[in-house]
Amino acid sequence: MPKLKTHRGAAKRFKVTGTGKIMRRRANKSHLLTGKPSKRTRHLRQIAQVDETQYKAIRMLIPYKF
């Protein structure tokens, strides 16, 4: 069986913790921030955990991070 290729875009966007959780950045934090309340932008700084329904798809994209 050939080697699996890592999806380079996914590799840059997702990090895997020591316990195997997949973490991601939150959306709506790249531009047009002046119209958003500071409370919202502050909460968008927090790293979020990927939902369990997406785990299988992301594991196929980044097979060697586990």
From Swiss-Prot:
Keywords: Ribonucleoprotein, Ribosomal protein
Keyword Ribosomal protein among record annotations: yes
GO molecular function: structural constituent of ribosome
Gene3D superfamilies, sorted: 4.10.410.60
GO CC annotations on file: cytosolic large ribosomal subunit
GO biological process: one example: translation
Cited InterPro entries: Ribosomal_bL35 (IPR001706), Ribosomal_bL35-like (IPR021137), Ribosomal_bL35_CS (IPR018265), Ribosomal_bL35_sf (IPR037229)
Superkingdom as given in the UniProt entry: Bacteria
Keyword Ribosomal protein: yes
Family indicated by similarity: Belongs to the bacterial ribosomal protein bL35 family.
Name the record gives this protein: Large ribosomal subunit protein bL35
